[in-house]
């Protein structure tokens, strides 16, 4: 606990919070172009082929982004929208691609949690 005299001499230092998605430069989403679309395997207890893409953002930074949902239409030079959000079992993947925007199509035949996968309401 500092004395009043010590506080007069120098103010308290503000704690700066470190961002978890620095490549977005304090924006909610960023546009980018896919440079490579491939699959990776997750960390130890899990086993799968996770779909990821290397994306060059408009900020000029190249990041690895996860492609959520079953099936996708992405290939090299596709224009995508990237949001923050890491994938726990893929080291180095700290971004998600937004489904149903720009060149990314929504997930086919999806009926639940549609808004997260860019799917319009089905005709009843």
Curated annotation (Swiss-Prot):
The answer to keyword RNA-binding applying to this record is yes
Q: Does the keyword RNA-binding apply?
A: yes
Give the domain of life: Eukaryota
Instruction: List the CDD domains.
Output: Ribosomal_S12
The record, for PROSITE patterns, names: RIBOSOMAL_S12 (PS00055)
GO cellular component terms given for this protein: chloroplast; small ribosomal subunit
Q: Name one GO biological process term.
A: translation
The alphabetized UniProt keywords are: Chloroplast, Plastid, Ribonucleoprotein, Ribosomal protein, RNA-binding, rRNA-binding
Its gene is rps12
Q: Where would you find this protein in the cell?
A: Plastid, Chloroplast
Q: Give the InterPro entries listed for this entry.
A: NA-bd_OB-fold, Ribosomal_uS12, Ribosomal_uS12_bac
Gene Ontology molecular-function annotations: rRNA binding; structural constituent of ribosome
Q: Which family does it belong to?
A: Belongs to the universal ribosomal protein uS12 family.
Q: Which HAMAP family match?
A: Ribosomal_uS12_B
Q: What does this protein do?
A: With S4 and S5 plays an important role in translational accuracy. Located at the interface of the 30S and 50S subunits.
Protein name in the entry: Small ribosomal subunit protein uS12c
């Amino acid at each position: 606990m500092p004395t009043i005299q010590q506080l007069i001499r120098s103010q308290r230092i503000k704690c700066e919070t470190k961002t978890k998605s620095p490549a977005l430069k304090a924006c909610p989403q960023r546009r980018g172009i896919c440079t490579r679309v491939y699959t990776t395997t997750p960390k130890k207890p899990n086993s799968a082929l996770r779909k990821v893409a290397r994306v060059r953002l408009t900020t000029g930074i190249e990041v690895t982004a996860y492609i959520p949902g079953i099936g996708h239409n992405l290939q090299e030079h596709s224009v995508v929208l990237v949001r923050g959000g890491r994938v726990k079992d893929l080291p180095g993947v700290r971004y998600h691609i937004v489904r149903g925007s720009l060149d990314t199509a929504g997930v086919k035949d999806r009926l639940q949690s549609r808004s997260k996968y860019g799917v319009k309401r089905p005709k009843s």
